[in-house]
Swiss-Prot record:
Top-rank taxon, per record: Bacteria
Alphabetic keyword roster: ATP-binding, Calcium, Calcium transport, Cell membrane, Ion transport, Membrane, Metal-binding, Nucleotide-binding, Phosphoprotein, Translocase, Transmembrane, Transmembrane helix, Transport
pH dependence: Optimum pH is 9.0.
Species in which this protein is naturally found: Listeria monocytogenes serovar 1/2a (strain ATCC BAA-679 / EGD-e)
The keyword Mitochondrion belongs to this UniProt entry's keyword annotation: no
Protein name stated in the entry: Calcium-transporting ATPase lmo0841
GO biological process, one term: monoatomic ion transmembrane transport
Reaction equation(s) it catalyzes: Ca(2+)(in) + ATP + H2O = Ca(2+)(out) + ADP + phosphate + H(+)
Protein location: Cell membrane
Amino acid sequence: MEIYRKSAAETFTQLEATEKGLTTSEVTKRQEKYGFNELKNKKKDPLWKLFLETFKDPMVIVLVIAALVQLVLGEVVESLIIFLVLIVNSIISVVQTRKAESSLDALREMSAPVAKVIRDGSKQSIHARELVPGDVVILDAGDFVPADGRLFESGSLKIDEGMLTGESEAVEKYIDTIPDEVGLGDRVNMVFSGSLVVYGRGMFVVTGTASETEIGKIAGLLETAEAKQTPLQRKLESFSKKLGLGILALCVLIFAVEAGRVLLGDNSADMATAILNAFMFAVAVAVAAIPEALSSIVTIVLAVGTNKMAKQHAIIRKLPAVETLGSTSVICTDKTGTLTQNKMTVVDYYLPDGTKENFPESPENWSEGERRLIHIAVLCNDSNINSEGKELGDPTEVALIAFSNKNNQDYNEIREKFIREGEIPFDSDRKLMSTLHTFNENKAMLTKGGPDVMFARCSYVFLDGEEKPMTEEILAKLKETNEEFSNQALRVLAYGYKRMPADTTELKLEDEQDIVLVGLTAMIDPPREAVYASIEESKKAGIRTVMITGDHKTTAQAIGRDIGLMDADDIALTGQELDAMPEEELDKKLEHIAVYARVSPENKIRIVKAWQKKGKITAMTGDGVNDAPALKQADIGVAMGSGTDVAKDSAAMILTDDNFVSIVDAVGVGRTVFDNIKKSIAYLFAGNLGAIIAILFALVLDWINPFTALQLLFINLVNDSLPAIALGMEKAEPDVMKRKPRDINEGIFAGGTMRAVISRGVLIGIAVIISQYIGMQISPEMSVAMAFTTLILARTLQTFAARSNVQTAFGAGFFSNKYVIGAVLLCFVLYGITVLPGAREIFSIPASFGLHEWSIAAGLALAAVVMMEIIKVVQNKFFK
């Protein structure tokens, strides 16, 4: 049986402890048994292991093999270039992994550093890490709870448990036994490590420390929550495997054909040299086919996306998250602080004369009823706003003094004018608070509390400027108004006063009778203003928004309906209802559950997994410790900037303005980034395909290999990188936020990308073949030089065609992407370097290669690109 279902006495018996605390010797024994009250460090992998892990990627393995082959053949420069690219990518990956491991460190820092305990029969202050089960701990306002425990004393104790439960209001604590099984947020006789005491005092016996606390359990969930691959990572990994196998098979075939020619041909030739040439042909195909710079370019394009998102108030911690967010189909969002402002606010009020809603902004225009309502709300109140603007006290009471300030009445002026002379503190049993003040030499008790309790104690009502007897009609109207407010999920408080004898110096419980009712206030943690539009925008983008909160079901439903998150056929579930629901039933109802209330961290992970099981890319937003495991489990975790360090460190993205709108904006950027990555990939593979076609054509016709390995590496690693990165800077397509989310099984060459790769690759290949043929009429060396020049120019000019699969270069705005213009010009400069004296020999360009040959190569390259644009126009007009 759970501790909260046992009495305090039973708990002490189970723990073999008493209210007088443990003895020093008993503490020593228990520390040996339970250890210290701190979260254990999970052993981190050494840097060398993380570094080697990055070389498991199939594309990386293929590149390593290619580099080793180059090294064996004595091509040291080519080999070193490939290895350098791989090492840089690995270092970036290791740095990102190390940053992601900081979640548990933040959790450890949340533990209270000092605890007030009773040991050996006396009060002591100790380090919180020294606590053991059975210790008796004293709590006062402002204290962090140092361990989990069962309360046995409570004096108006209120604790903010929002970091664990997501609850927006402080929880009133009791010591009574709870007979039924309830969720974490309803265990009001328990306290939890890391939560904050905002009001009152109490004493509890420690029932759990370290990993046995609720925070400790969350730490365990963080360790077991799976880190998901992004859709792009999954697609590139799958494609890399297929590409590697395909290239291997092609290379073996090429080598077999060439070797067969040698063995079946003229044996008088130098067989060893011929076999080596055959092997070099195969290596050239491997180098031409593998886009060596692909990994680096994808990383850079994603980084460009992070900069764009930063301007939209979204900071990316993990680069692949940019692309993942763009493919998101479900956003599981916390309510408090995400959809709402995380600040209780008075939104309505009611006076017995019927006045409500619009409170006069100037105190001079207040009615006497409004003036008295404000005075009671401010004076019968223990909260404050300090000189730094920090709000201190219960959020509900802070809302009341903020209400006064909002209506141009400084609450401090009221308190300075009417000093508190006595009080009866708030008590969770009677649900009232009363204070004593003097008004114009007349003593009065001011009282605020729950409406039902106040109605029962009010014999009079302040109406039309006079104190009148409470009638059944007036009481019925008050109850009706209270019900209206409650149905809107508003928190209602009632206010009243009672005239006291002039010699009154202190208040007694029996004084809280025959009160004069003044009015009601209604408050709520209101939705963020921009949330309404962002929810609608997400619907247009085909994204399902689901609210997951620790708050009450009624409140969550009201907010959900208000902001348009819940449709007519949608339902809400509590954490307990979810726990009782079998997987099959959840699977059937999942798409109609818009709100989950009173949920636990385990519930959140289950919800995320349920959506992922349906193949949906799922984002999870949150700001509390309770959100951290689900943030890690989700395909992309989105933490609020004002949230806990634990949430931020578990997330892939952080919103600096805590604005839900920023998520929708970031989705648009993410979709654009993925579009641009596909453009870059198509650009790279079209160029590579053109090179392979030329090589295979030369092989079939027994021509000389049109390229050297160094030429291909120069194009793949240096020349192609600049335009590919520039394509990552393209602006969003007009329909980017009107499309449905991408199918996660959709390949990276879907949506016309493969068609573009093939058509552009074939045109580049044809241009190179023609150029090589023309060069062969002069010399074998000239054929290589012309093939290389045509390939590099065609691939460079292809950048303009690659900007869009729909629009031509002029349709998209020829100069609208200045990075493309700059990249193309720089590529021409880089090519110019290869024909300079000294460099010609390195790149196998003969001295006789001049302007005439260059003009032929350039003309063929330009013709290929013009044909690409013509094909694009024809396809879009007749085959759309």
